[in-house]
Curated annotation (Swiss-Prot):
Family (UniProt): Belongs to the MOZART1 family.
Function: Required for gamma-tubulin complex recruitment to the microtubule organizing center (MTOC).
Higher taxonomy: Eukaryota, Fungi, Dikarya, Ascomycota, Pezizomycotina
InterPro entries named in the record: MZT1
Protein's UniProt name: Mitotic-spindle organizing protein 1
Any one of the GO CC terms: spindle
Keywords for the protein's UniProt record, in alphabetical order: Cytoplasm, Cytoskeleton
NADP keyword on record: no
Subunit structure: Part of the gamma-tubulin complex.
Taxonomic superkingdom: Eukaryota
Transmembrane parts of this sequence: none
Provenance organism: Chaetomium globosum (strain ATCC 6205 / CBS 148.51 / DSM 1962 / NBRC 6347 / NRRL 1970)
């Protein structure tokens, strides 16, 4: 592939990612450019887009649950910690 064609393809791919990122931002999807690029690549390789969307939703849900559990554990541990006395 000639260098010029490759550069044009890269520019077109970057433009597509930028447009999809703008759409993602407008729709409050909270997907960064890297994540969008990965999703695009997976879809281009034949992954079902709807299934991929469901996986992303499930991962987000689990991530939020883990953050809540970690925050609760941190709060519980800080409330039960007795400050040490210095002599």
């Amino acid at each position: 592939m000639p260098p010029n064609d490759r550069a044009e393809k890269q520019a077109a791919a970057q433009q597509a990612v930028n447009i999809l990122h703008e759409i993602s931002t407008i729709l409050n999807c909270h997907l960064d450019r890297q994540t969008l690029s990965i999703c695009i690549s997976m879809i281009e390789k034949g992954i079902n887009p709807e299934a991929l969307a469901n996986v992303v939703k499930e991962l987000r849900k689990k991530g939020q649950e883990n953050q809540l559990e970690a925050a609760a554990a941190a709060a519980a541990s800080s409330s039960t910690t007795v400050p040490s006395r210095r002599r």
